[in-house]
Amino acid sequence: MIARLAGRIAEKRDDHAIVDVGGVGYLVHLSQLSLASLPPPGEPAALRVYTHVREDALDLYGFATEDEEAVFRALIDVKGVGPRAAQNILSGIEARELAQAVAQGDVARLTKVQGIGKKTAERLVLELKEKLVALARAAGPARAGAEADVLEQLRTALLNLGYRPPQAEGVAEALRDSAEGRPLDDLLREALKRLRG
């Protein structure tokens, strides 16, 4: 089983990236949020990986964060939700936000995500509420402080520049750890560099 890949980004596509590790290119399926957080091609990157083995294929699903991987693994335990569907769901909602919606039983919020109908949303709440409660608590009721403000401004700026919400959210999440004390224009430059790569 492959659990982690560290190498250089060779290519970025709509729903996957190719990671070059020692001259071997691994095709890794990624959510839009994780894909947006990757550096441009040629730059080093490390991804957490879930290896899905089928009779006729071996697929790799990658994650930029531990939270996204945890939610993905919980999602694929739900009847009727496979790895591809779980990845599509995580392209439409950030992992901690999904965990909060499930923990709060917010079926209306879940059905706004492409790929989640009412029955699936109810099943997610029923089957995952206990599993995701710790992650939902870690997310807290709201992001607070100056870091949250500058990240929200970054998201808004990216949306105004024409980027899709999952792209804006993904790159903002990727820059969260380095956002403290940095001005918006500095973060925006780095975000645009990542998105254009």
Curated annotation (Swiss-Prot):
Localisation: Cytoplasm
Which SUPFAM superfamilies does the entry link to? DNA helicase RuvA subunit, C-terminal domain, Nucleic acid-binding proteins, RuvA domain 2-like
**Location of the region described as Domain III in the Swiss-Prot/TrEMBL record:** 146-197
Tell me what this protein is called. Answer: Holliday junction branch migration complex subunit RuvA
- The organism encoding this protein is Anaeromyxobacter sp. (strain K)
A GO molecular function term, named singly, is: ATP binding
Quaternary structure and partners: Homotetramer. Forms an RuvA(8)-RuvB(12)-Holliday junction (HJ) complex. HJ DNA is sandwiched between 2 RuvA tetramers; dsDNA enters through RuvA and exits via RuvB. An RuvB hexamer assembles on each DNA strand where it exits the tetramer. Each RuvB hexamer is contacted by two RuvA subunits (via domain III) on 2 adjacent RuvB subunits; this complex drives branch migration. In the full resolvosome a probable DNA-RuvA(4)-RuvB(12)-RuvC(2) complex forms which resolves the HJ.
For region Domain I, the annotated ranges are: 1-64
Q: Which GO terms describe its cellular component?
A: cytoplasm; Holliday junction helicase complex; Holliday junction resolvase complex
Record remark on domains: Has three domains with a flexible linker between the domains II and III and assumes an 'L' shape. Domain III is highly mobile and contacts RuvB.
NCBIfam families assigned to the protein according to its UniProt record, in alphabetical order: ruvA
> Where along the sequence do coiled-coil regions lie?
none
Q: Which domain of life is it from?
A: Bacteria
User: What are its GO biological-process terms?
Assistant: DNA recombination; DNA repair
Record's keyword terms, sorted = Cytoplasm, DNA damage, DNA recombination, DNA repair, DNA-binding
Region described as Flexible linker: spans on this chain: 141-145
